[in-house]
Amino acid sequence: MSKERPKRNIIQKKYDDSDGIPWSEERVVRKVLYLSLKEFKNSQKRQHAEGIAGSLKTVNGLLGNDQSKGLGPASEQSENEKDDASQVSSTSNDVSSSDFEEGPSRKRPRLQAQRKFAQSQPNSPSTTPVKIVEPLLPPPATQISDLSKRKPKTEDFLTFLCLRGSPALPNSMVYFGSSQDEEEVEEEDDETEDVKTATNNASSSCQSTPRKGKTHKHVHNGHVFNGSSRSTREKEPVQKHKSKEATPAKEKHSDHRADSRREQASANHPAAAPSTGSSAKGLAATHHHPPLHRSAQDLRKQVSKVNGVTRMSSLGAGVTSAKKMREVRPSPSKTVKYTATVTKGAVTYTKAKRELVKDTKPNHHKPSSAVNHTISGKTESSNAKTRKQVLSLGGASKSTGPAVNGLKVSGRLNPKSCTKEVGGRQLREGLQLREGLRNSKRRLEEAHQAEKPQSPPKKMKGAAGPAEGPGKKAPAERGLLNGHVKKEVPERSLERNRPKRATAGKSTPGRQAHGKADSASCENRSTSQPESVHKPQDSGKAEKGGGKAGWAAMDEIPVLRPSAKEFHDPLIYIESVRAQVEKFGMCRVIPPPDWRPECKLNDEMRFVTQIQHIHKLGRRWGPNVQRLACIKKHLKSQGITMDELPLIGGCELDLACFFRLINEMGGMQQVTDLKKWNKLADMLRIPRTAQDRLAKLQEAYCQYLLSYDSLSPEEHRRLEKEVLMEKEILEKRKGPLEGHTENDHHKFHPLPRFEPKNGLIHGVAPRNGFRSKLKEVGQAQLKTGRRRLFAQEKEVVKEEEEDKGVLNDFHKCIYKGRSVSLTTFYRTARNIMSMCFSKEPAPAEIEQEYWRLVEEKDCHVAVHCGKVDTNTHGSGFPVGKSEPFSRHGWNLTVLPNNTGSILRHLGAVPGVTIPWLNIGMVFSTSCWSRDQNHLPYIDYLHTGADCIWYCIPAEEENKLEDVVHTLLQANGTPGLQMLESNVMISPEVLCKEGIKVHRTVQQSGQFVVCFPGSFVSKVCCGYSVSETVHFATTQWTSMGFETAKEMKRRHIAKPFSMEKLLYQIAQAEAKKENGPTLSTISALLDELRDTELRQRRQLFEAGLHSSARYGSHDGSSTVADGKKKPRKWLQLETSERRCQICQHLCYLSMVVQENENVVFCLECALRHVEKQKSCRGLKLMYRYDEEQIISLVNQICGKVSGKNGSIENCLSKPTPKRGPRKRATVDVPPSRLSASSSSKSASSSS
């Protein structure tokens, strides 16, 4: 036994034990192996009797000088292979430990097996100590050398039992899989380099035995040399795996060609190491055994390159220095000793094997798939990153060793370690997820500084080539690979790129959420934009980079940088710069450096998303949509309904592209037989991180495409004709698909829409449109008088029932999503980013790809966005009294109460005075639109990626209407109405038509201020969270009043009542005697009073004499108040009292159908009475009587006239009861004007 390894006290057992194999069988196996080794030694002695002395002399000379005279190429081969095999120990079958002594003069140990399985771990030190090798001479030929110095492990005996009686059984125990020390690797590498010449007697000493032709070269004369025995023993598992997975015939032919090419290469390059030349000669002499030659040479070259040991560096080194290096150097090879990994029954090729394949393939004249043509799809996908890095490492290591060693230490040369790192990275990202969802600007910068040391490994993992520095070699090698291996290239090149894409998907949204978009993206773009307001176009050109020439016509919006003193009150500051920036439609405000509010969001807050089909945001119809319509039509004929596309990893599957790709690859059967599902999933850009992506992909094919795929080409053409005919009929009846809205009949919209309206997505109705709203009203209402009052409603329902064809919802591009948490949304955003981009893109790249998708419509892209009411889930701004910036004027939760905003009189109105969060991902879009009330608003980007804004000033409205009407071919439909139906038109197209379009890129921590009437569009560049709220100054009231009348005419529901706002302003400002405000609203109050009183008189003249008052809280009610109970409908919120015809929000008065609780505004009620010729069941409900309205308006006009010295514009009707009326008017409290609820009602008939 060895001195360092004491003999164990072995207890003799006659029964089986659970650990290892029975002792009795182990002794028998040892005897069998001993006899096998002895027989092999004897046969070698007989065959090489003449070469024993010469071989020993060569070994002695090798230790003393740089010449190799008698060892022969066979020994040199074994030493070269030993250099390679030092890097190649299997993670599953081999042992990465060294249990033996290097010195041959030490006592040879008795052959003994360990009892337990060795358990070496990837990228970890071996479990046994490393022995220090003494530079002693080899033993004489007469010394007993039948036994190997190796201490075989249990795996070796199990391997022997499995291979017994087959040609795969090694001739010698030295071929089994004990590992070795890195010190020996260094020694063997140096010895190989020091060999200058080779003798020709190797041809006679390399006879092969009929039992195993591959292994004869490693033992020459019965002595087990350190180099040859260890290298061959290390090499054998590689050969065994190759025998399982590769075709031997192809290997032999390709290896023979590789050998001859290497011989030519060594002859053409005399500057290489002399050992290369001698190896070539040895190969030429023993060319009848090509597989092992190929393995030895290639592994020697590749592994030495990976470890950074160059032969040129050691040519001039002496033996003494080589020995010293061998004894002192650490053992880096333990991080890369992996030969094969068995996963799910398939043998996965790993580091050294793929290095061998990569180095061998460029030397073939013909394409060869002998090495990895049997790799399964799952195996390829799990190791695609490692293969990609190996391809890059091959070129990188030629020029620099330390750089590769740095990669080696980071643990990326083994698939198992690569998988572990991927899992670790996912764990780290999961830990960072909460922080990434809600980081403020302050946290973003801290996180960016903390992540700087970690970002290079992440980038190297996703794209090893560019990160490793010597990328000059890698492209050349890839070119060789593409030139020589034609069949393998498409798949390999695809799988080189896909891991890169998946990695970017995992890192990009995280980086964006951690503020890298705030800092790193600024480095990629010009910094002139935020620095100067006077040079917006320069920064725009810098940001857009190589954009199209047509985009040059767009100007950048002004960028404002207020000082700390100016950055106090937003409305005062905006008013001060309004004259300069309002003509652009919007401006961007960069706060002072000390403005850093912390963004606090609940990671688990849930909200309902909206699904946007980006490819349908322009023209609804395209090649992808047409194919999907054919699939849906066929499924419908089979009785299969596909309401939603299948989801994989939160991303919608592109069925049309799926069908095309699977047919291009030969159909499902061929994809399954060739195990191409992984490749197909990559081509569909399904994230690799998606759970069970292959299973879900196969399930989707069987469920939705199998039947359609089985149709004949004639049936496919017939389906296409039917779909196109149906589309033509639909467009003839309703016009272009872009003009179809999700609720074409606004006048029958029974309930208000409470979702926020910021002029971006513009109040998208649920995906079921009017029908779902109709169901919410209740079946009881449809069974009674409403059918008499609204006979046309039945017609609408009938039309929709008739339109249950395939194309009935193809005009939609925005759908209602599902309820998700913020964490889930973030992960979905990360997956979609990885689908669309292979690395973190710049805003210019995202902009270019976005408009390509919108215009070409060749693939299905679905993204999500969400709007969250901060009143429910909390704001991103600090709100606690003790928190910094919680009372700052630019805090958007404080802005609605700003004294300069007239909207403060409305109270809390969702989507108007209550801020809301906009949560988006890459390509999330706010289509061209303006706020329906033409209200200005402020948007603040809390965290995440940049947002690209486009703006058209309000002055371009008329020109824009004409252009849009022409572009969209709106047959009678107003152009702006179609534009606001979620239609995206490229700013380039609008610029060419003469429309002024301005652009800017909002970054995290910046404000965007949109002015009244501007048309705005926004595209997100990744996961982002922003917050928006409206404001309004006195100057807006005139525009708002006209807008309210237009919305009433178009039957569009308003989020608040303009009458209520005007009366609340009059009530509040009259007490303060705010002259400028009162003078602005006085004319509007006059017009409102005249219209209200005129319509009441017309209804009275038409026969409506029944009336009642609601919303009063004083004691001025009549005696009849206590006789009637308040009706249920009077308890409804004011926002729910909408006219069923025009959606007008009734505040001053309404007409009610008492039996059915149906509400009309006065104008619509007058039309109804004229049409029905009866007022039966109708009652007028009013908030203020005629005298109160007149008194309020007179009061305002009186205060204005006091300032102006004139009362001619004020209409007054003095009556004997003016005093009481005046008191009643004064007693009306503001709480009554809010009319949130009514406690009593009075009804009387006259």
Swiss-Prot record:
The modification Phosphoserine is found at residues 78, 455. A motif (Nuclear localization signal) lies at residues 104-110. Residues 621-713 form the ARID domain. A motif (GSGFP motif) lies at residues 874-878. InterPro entries: ARID_dom, ARID_dom_sf, JmjC_dom, JmjN, Znf_C5HC2. Residues 141-170 are annotated as: Sufficient for interaction with the PRC2 complex. CDD domains: ARID_JARD2. Residues 117-129, 197-210, 369-384, 521-531 have a biased composition (Polar residues). Residues 180-193 have a biased composition (Acidic residues). Residues 231-264, 418-451, 485-497, 532-546 have a biased composition (Basic and acidic residues). One of its GO terms (biological process) is spleen development. It holds the Pfam family JmjC. One of its GO terms (molecular function) is chromatin binding. Regulator of histone methyltransferase complexes that plays an essential role in embryonic development, including heart and liver development, neural tube fusion process and hematopoiesis. Acts as an accessory subunit for the core PRC2 (Polycomb repressive complex 2) complex, which mediates histone H3K27 (H3K27me3) trimethylation on chromatin. Binds DNA and mediates the recruitment of the PRC2 complex to target genes in embryonic stem cells, thereby playing a key role in stem cell differentiation and normal embryonic development. This is Protein Jumonji.
